[in-house]
Amino acid sequence: MMTTAQYLRQIENYDNRIKNKLIEEEQLSSLSTSVSAIPVGEKVQTSVKRDPMGDMVAKIFDLREEISEMISEFLQKRQEIVRTIEQVEDPLLYDILFKRYVEYKSLVRIADEMGYSEIHMKRMHLKAVAEVKKIKGFEK
């Protein structure tokens, strides 16, 4: 079963996976421009012709489709989690959750921005996560 923290971190996890896939796609695209033409010469044996450029284009196309699906899943999951966070009634706890799990800010940075000590912010964060736990019914 998923913990509350795992549930909330899904947005950032999806985002990181998408960024990595985009890097992979960029590398493949770069590689595809460096695929050289196969020299045509005498052939001793006939075999099935390979099309390295076509193979590369197909891989890039498949990867772009995968990225598109991941982005769609990311947007759905993000919307779901944001709606869950919006159910937290205390505005301070809402702000902490939004900054931490939607904007990916550290608790230290949030504490600094909001004018609280790190220890107080950690306590408030635990309280905020407990609210989400109640809303979602996790870890009963």
Where are these regions (language model features)?
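N-terminal positioning helix adjacent to the helix-turn-helix/winged-helix DNA-binding module
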Residues: 77-80, 91-93, 124
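N-terminal interaction/assembly modules
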Residues: 1-84, 130, 136-140
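DNA major-groove recognition helices of helix-turn-helix
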Residues: 121-132
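Short amphipathic alpha helix immediately N-terminal
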Residues: 89-103
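Secondary-structure boundary motif
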Residues: 87-90, 134
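Short alpha-helical "recognition helix" segments of helix-turn-helix
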Residues: 109-114
